[in-house]
């Protein structure tokens, strides 16, 4: 019962200490752990004095060297307990069972497989011995064919074959077993797959054939004699010497690499053979062979097959001499084709020889390159561990777990360890002498760590631990649970011996983790630089050919980079294809025309659906596009600012000179003064861009202000209105209806104000008072100048002007200036805003898409408002 409770207490304390670097275990060190310890002391039957002696003996060492405290059963329990430890990142305990036997089994299996299938080093000696055995069997089998050596060689051959059968049988069994180290040959299905390999089938066949030969021995019966011929099957054992087929692979690669050359040589040689054989057959088929007595014998070239035999022997430079041409014609043909055919028959031998030489050289170079694999793998591993040991990367845990299992961590100096060990042994001896249950008490105090060892050998004495113990690092981590428990006990008892010896209880493993990690980090940096240096040494060129190849590769890479850079530069600075159609010719006869594709309402940078050509996507094309946009914006801003300044100037003039005064003597005097001060009249220059007679390109007319509607439209013909037209009431009644239209619309010059000076009126009856219903010439002159100012608004409506980027709002409200004693609506109230009828570019070339307002298109204006011209309507 006490043992189970101690396990639970140790597990609770260890879990709290190991979880977050002492956070859980140190939360209540004097409360929970002390209470649990007191309960366990009562359960195991310890007296208070015994506990104090044990604490006095073991308290000072718990937080300094845990390996000495655990050595009581550490050797035995290390083989059986599940290894648990806390990682360098203070994670939860990890359970990683070490399968030493399994690893050893796999290592031996891999070693045997490599020795039999991929021999290197000492394994080549075994294969050389097998080759000598096979060669000896073959030599003895040849000697048995001699009568004088048949008996002796037969006896030795029987012994050697028996030995070879055992050797080859054991080797075959080892091959089948060792093949399990490969993933594709694991299990009985994988072993069957391995046994179906060609060389394994050859071994099985030779073993089966050798067993009956050895069984019958040297008997003289017919069965034994017939079975002895199977001994020559041992020649097939020579094939098994090259288990990996390197020879055949080399020959096959040479033939495949020069297959076209070989086919060409064999093809031309075959054509030469059949042609020469046929011609010699035609010439020599009717020539009989003469013997020594002069008698005729059968012809040497009786058939075409005889001629082919002669051609093959001759062109292959063998020359048996059994068949030769007898006539001079045949000899001439044979000599001619021999000079041609021999060269082509000998050509494949040279091709194969050069191909094999090149392949051998390539294999040597490949072996040289294979030497880079290990340094490259070491460099990659060192680079990863150098990266994984970055203290800022808290998510990389696997590398720290690796060091947890391989790093030996000596906590103290050697002299401190020896002194502490000797002093602890003395104290433990005194405790054991005073209390025979001391050893059991120690074991039960450390039950969470050494349960199995305490149960089997409770009276084992602790032994000092050397600094090379592989379990020291992991064991020290497991001591944290006891360290927290011991710190709580020391806090309650106030052990003076701890203070005298100068060891603090707060010296835990967490204090050493940053130092250990920094040391590991430094080692990783050094190893990374070392492996990098080794890898650079292996990059040295193999021969001059490698140097030339490296220079050639570098030159090609440099050329490709230069070409790429040149392409990018050309793309940036070379103008691409034009993004817009060709400019249209400017229209003749118009006072002012805009460049094509640059209408104020249709900006040049706005993409059009009708444009088929793609825009230039180069950097220079984009620069040009932005420059055009900025230029167009500048022109629009200049236009708007100029128009605004002109408008404000005229407003200031009107405010200054038309403000009503109370001291006006009479209408006649006022008109006289105004005539003296103002002599300029507003003129509107209209030009019809439509086709027609160019006699009057411009027409001048004057418009009185009382004939102007709210939006600047005239009720009657301007010429008639200036010469004593009807009253304003009658003029308002004659305003144009919405249904009236006009045939032609003028094109007004942009930003053009022409003031016609020195204009006088001959009829004094037209002059009226300044406050009468009829407008005086001075008022007409000023009002006409402001109401019908020939400012081209560049086809910009009110909304566009209000959104103008210049910041000037043309349609901004201003103070109403009243010109008249009645205080009613005056012309200034009606003309505060620029009328849409005053916009200019409503001609066909610049008419925007979509419906336009009637005031802009002129659909609601009659033809009588424009000056009559000679143009046909």
UniProtKB/Swiss-Prot annotation:
Regulation of its function: Phosphatidylinositol-4,5-bisphosphate (PIP2) potentiates the activation of KCNQ channels by enhancing the electro-mechanical coupling of the voltage-sensing domain (VSD) and the pore-forming domain (PD). In the closed state of the channel, PIP2 is anchored at the S2-S3 loop; upon channel activation, PIP2 interacts with the S4-S5 linker and is involved in channel gating. Calcium suppresses KCNQ2-KCNQ3 channel currents, with calcium-bound calmodulin inducing a change in channel configuration which leads to the reduction of channel affinity for PIP2 and subsequent current suppression.
Intramembrane spans: 304-316
An example molecular function term from Gene Ontology annotations: transmembrane transporter binding
Annotated spans, Mediates interaction with calmodulin: 357-538
Superkingdom of the organism of origin: Eukaryota
Gene3D superfamilies associated with the record: 1.10.287.70, 6.10.140.1910
Subunit annotation: Heterotetramer with KCNQ2; forms heterotetrameric M-channel responsible for the native M-current. Interacts with calmodulin; the interaction is calcium-independent, constitutive and participates in the proper assembly of a functional M-channel. Heteromultimer with KCNQ5. May associate with KCNE2. Interacts with IQCJ-SCHIP1. Interacts (via the pore module) with SLC5A3/SMIT1; forms a coregulatory complex that alters ion selectivity, voltage dependence and gating kinetics of the channel.
Protein name: Potassium voltage-gated channel subfamily KQT member 3
């Amino acid at each position: 019962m006490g043992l189970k409770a101690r396990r639970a207490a140790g597990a609770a304390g260890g879990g709290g200490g190991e979880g977050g670097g002492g956070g859980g275990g140190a939360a209540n060190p004097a409360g929970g752990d002390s209470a649990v310890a007191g309960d366990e002391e009562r359960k195991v039957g310890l007296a208070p004095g015994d506990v104090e002696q044990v604490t006095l003996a073991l308290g000072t060492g718990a937080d300094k060297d845990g390996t000495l405290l655990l050595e009581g059963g550490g050797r035995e329990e290390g083989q059986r307990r599940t290894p648990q430890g806390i990682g360098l990142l203070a994670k939860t305990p990890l359970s990683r069972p070490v399968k030493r036997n399994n690893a050893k089994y796999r290592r031996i299996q891999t070693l045997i497989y490599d020795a039999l299938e991929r021999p290197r080093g000492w394994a080549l000696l075994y294969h050389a011995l097998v080759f000598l055995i096979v060669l000896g069997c073959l030599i003895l089998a040849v000697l048995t064919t001699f009568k004088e050596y048949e008996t002796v060689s037969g006896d030795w051959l029987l012994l050697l074959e028996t030995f070879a059968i055992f050797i080859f049988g054991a080797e075959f069994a080892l091959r089948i077993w060792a093949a399990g180290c490969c993933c594709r040959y694991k299990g009985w299905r994988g072993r069957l797959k391995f046994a179906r390999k060609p060389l394994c089938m050859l071994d099985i066949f030779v073993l089966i054939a050798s067993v009956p030969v050895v069984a019958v021995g040297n008997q003289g019966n017919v069965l034994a004699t017939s079975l002895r011929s199977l001994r020559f099957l041992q020649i097939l054992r020579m094939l098994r010497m090259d288990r990996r087929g390197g020879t055949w692979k080399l020959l096959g690669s040479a033939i495949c690499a020069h297959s076209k050359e070989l086919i060409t040589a064999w093809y031309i040689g075959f054509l030469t053979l059949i042609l020469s054989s046929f011609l010699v057959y035609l010439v020599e088929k009717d020539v009989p062979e003469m013997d020594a007595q002069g008698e005729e014998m059968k012809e040497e070239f009786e058939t075409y097959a005889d001629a082919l035999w002669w051609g093959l022997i001759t062109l292959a430079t063998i020359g048996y001499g059994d068949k030769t041409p007898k006539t001079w014609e045949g000899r001439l043909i044979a000599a001619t084709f021999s000079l041609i055919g021999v060269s082509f028959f000998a050509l494949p031998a040279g091709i194969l020889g050069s191909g094999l030489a090149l392949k051998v050289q390539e294999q040597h170079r490949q072996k040289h390159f294979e030497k880079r694999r290990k340094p490259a793998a070491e460099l990659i591993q060192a680079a990863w561990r150098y990266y994984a040991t970055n203290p800022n990367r808290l998510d990389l845990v696997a590398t720290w777990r690796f060091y947890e299992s391989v790093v030996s961590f000596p906590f103290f100096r050697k002299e401190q360890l020896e002194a502490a060990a000797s002093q602890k042994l003395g104290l433990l001896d005194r405790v054991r002498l005073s209390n025979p249950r001391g050893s059991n008490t120690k074991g039960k105090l450390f039950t969470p760590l050494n349960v199995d060892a305490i149960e089997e050998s409770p009276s084992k004495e602790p032994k000092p631990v050397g600094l090379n113990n592989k379990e020291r690092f992991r064991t020290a981590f497991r001591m944290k649970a006891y360290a927290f428990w011991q710190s709580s006990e020391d806090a309650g008892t106030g052990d003076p011996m701890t203070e005298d010896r100068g060891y603090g209880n707060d010296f835990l493993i967490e204090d050493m983790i940053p130092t250990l990690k920094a040391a590991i980090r430094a080692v990783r940096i050094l190893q990374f630089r070392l492996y990098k240096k080794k890898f650079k040494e292996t990059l040295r060129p193999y021969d001059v050919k490698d140097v030339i190849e490296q220079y050639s590769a570098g030159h090609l890479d440099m050329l490709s980079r230069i070409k790429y850079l040149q392409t990018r530069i050309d793309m940036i600075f070379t103008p691409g294809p034009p993004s817009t159609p060709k400019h249209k010719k400017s229209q003749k006869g118009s006072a002012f025309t805009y460049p094509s594709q640059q209408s104020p309402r249709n900006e040049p940078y706005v993409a059009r659906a009708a444009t088929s050509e793609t825009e230039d996507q180069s950097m220079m094309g984009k620069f040009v596009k932005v420059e055009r946009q900025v230029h167009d914006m500048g022109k629009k801003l200049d236009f708007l600012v100029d128009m605004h300044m002109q408008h404000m100037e005229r407003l200031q003039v009107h405010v200054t000179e038309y403000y009503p005064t109370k001291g006006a003597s009479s209408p006649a005097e006022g008109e006289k003064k105004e005539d003296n001060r103002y002599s300029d009249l507003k003129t509107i220059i209209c030009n019809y861009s439509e086709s027609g007679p160019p006699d009057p390109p411009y027409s001048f007319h004057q418009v009185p202000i009382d004939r102007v509607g709210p939006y600047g439209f005239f009720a009657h013909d301007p010429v008639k209105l200036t010469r004593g037209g009807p009253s304003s009431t009658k003029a308002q009644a004659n305003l144009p209806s919405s249904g009236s239209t006009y045939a032609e619309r003028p094109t007004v010059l942009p930003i053009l104000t022409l003031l016609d000076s020195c204009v006088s009126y001959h009829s004094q009856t037209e002059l009226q008072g300044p406050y009468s219903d009829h407008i005086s010439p001075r008022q007409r002159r000023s009002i006409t100048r402001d109401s019908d100012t020939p400012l081209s608004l560049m086809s910009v409506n009110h909304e566009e002007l209000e959104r103008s980027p210049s910041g000037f709002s043309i349609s901004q409200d201003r103070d109403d200036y009243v010109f008249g004693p009645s205080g009613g609506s005056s012309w200034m109230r009606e003309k505060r805003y620029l009328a849409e009828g005053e916009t200019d570019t409503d001609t066909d070339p610049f008419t925007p898409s979509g419906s336009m307002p009637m005031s802009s298109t002129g659909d609601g204006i009659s033809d009588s408002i424009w000056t009559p011209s000679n143009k046909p309507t």
